[in-house]
Amino acid sequence: MLYYLYEHFHINIFHYITFRAILAFFLSFFITIFIMPKFISWAKAKATQPIFELAPDNHKTKNSTPTMGGLIYITSAVISILITTEFNKYVLLTLLLLVYFTYLGFIDDYGKIKGSSNKAGLSAKTKFLLQWVGALVISYLLIKVGFDTKLYVPFYKYPIFDMGYYAVIFWAFIIVAMSNAVNLTDGLDGLATVPSIFSLFTLGILLYIVGNYKFSSYLFYPFELGVGELTIIVFALIGALLGFLWYNANPAEVFMGDSGSLPLGAVIGFLAIVAKSELLLIFIAFVFIMETVSVILQVGSYKTRGKRVFKMAPIHHHFEMLGWKENKITIRFWIMALITNLIAILSIKIR
């Protein structure tokens, strides 16, 4: 909306991505800050979080905490995005992805609330299938709008090969994997929120580079016209997440629920694809990947050997079972996320 003020009235400041990104940050932050208390008051009576029966004992006290807070911060971010961005093909695809995965998460959350059980809601198979459907459609549309299908690796400036239409499957895998990875990480107060902010900030830098001809040429990144607008989406999400963290910090007044974690992970995966940094996710999303790998190892070991690798998975529960306090686990995971994202940022120049 603001970009079109520049086009029609020549208000030059609205032309700059940096200005609109900062504005998007503040808009989504304050919308979330002001709306969330009203949502929490309503959700205390209508939408509390059912706690998994096998969760550590200290989680039982969280049974009355409202969930679906993700609906508020995603809505705040979308409002901010609609106000501050130029609607190009990448912006529209990102919005479509956000809306689809938020709706999918909402259906799952709603089922759990109505069923009064963490096992209610969508079945794992149904949710997984619907995630793949959405991810495949978005990935296919990304190719149809002419996006480059070459694959790049960290610390190397040239593409290793062109994936062609196989990119649809690879990109869909990235989106689904990240969606579930953030969902698995969202088990402690603030645990998924801050690493998501770090990941988004790193992706914001990468997207700005890929969308800027001078910077992309200097740093040997492929140039993609229009990708720079996604930097604004990144800052809208960061602002919304910081507003959410105000209420999600320990002791949490609200949880993001699948309504927040599924779209958040999906958009991190999608933005990494558009930033030509899919494989750099090993650093950008290290904490999320670590949590996911811990679950894969636990399930695989139990099914093949009848033994568990960890006391409980995802791995943050393992540390809880060892007697670590929730805040200590959360802050240490935040530190890991910060360090690995700094490595990812360093890789921009070391290529």
UniProtKB/Swiss-Prot annotation:
Protein name: Phospho-N-acetylmuramoyl-pentapeptide-transferase
Coiled coil: none
Topological type in the membrane: Multi-pass membrane protein
Catalytic activity: UDP-N-acetyl-alpha-D-muramoyl-L-alanyl-gamma-D-glutamyl-meso-2,6-diaminopimeloyl-D-alanyl-D-alanine + di-trans,octa-cis-undecaprenyl phosphate = di-trans,octa-cis-undecaprenyl diphospho-N-acetyl-alpha-D-muramoyl-L-alanyl-D-glutamyl-meso-2,6-diaminopimeloyl-D-alanyl-D-alanine + UMP
EC number: 2.7.8.13
Primary localization: membrane
GO MF annotations in UniProt: metal ion binding; phospho-N-acetylmuramoyl-pentapeptide-transferase activity; UDP-N-acetylmuramoyl-L-alanyl-D-glutamyl-meso-2,6-diaminopimelyl-D-alanyl-D-alanine:undecaprenyl-phosphate transferase activity
Keyword terms, alphabetized: Cell cycle, Cell division, Cell inner membrane, Cell membrane, Cell shape, Cell wall biogenesis/degradation, Magnesium, Membrane, Metal-binding, Peptidoglycan synthesis, Transferase, Transmembrane, Transmembrane helix
Pathway note: Cell wall biogenesis; peptidoglycan biosynthesis
Described purpose of this protein according to its UniProt entry: Catalyzes the initial step of the lipid cycle reactions in the biosynthesis of the cell wall peptidoglycan: transfers peptidoglycan precursor phospho-MurNAc-pentapeptide from UDP-MurNAc-pentapeptide onto the lipid carrier undecaprenyl phosphate, yielding undecaprenyl-pyrophosphoryl-MurNAc-pentapeptide, known as lipid I.
GO biological process, one term: regulation of cell shape
Annotated organism of origin: Nautilia profundicola (strain ATCC BAA-1463 / DSM 18972 / AmH)
Cofactor(s) the record lists: Mg(2+)
Top-level EC class as recorded in UniProt: transferase
PROSITE patterns per UniProt: MRAY_2
Transmembrane regions listed in the UniProt entry: 22-42, 65-85, 87-107, 128-148, 158-178, 190-210, 225-245, 254-274, 279-299, 328-348
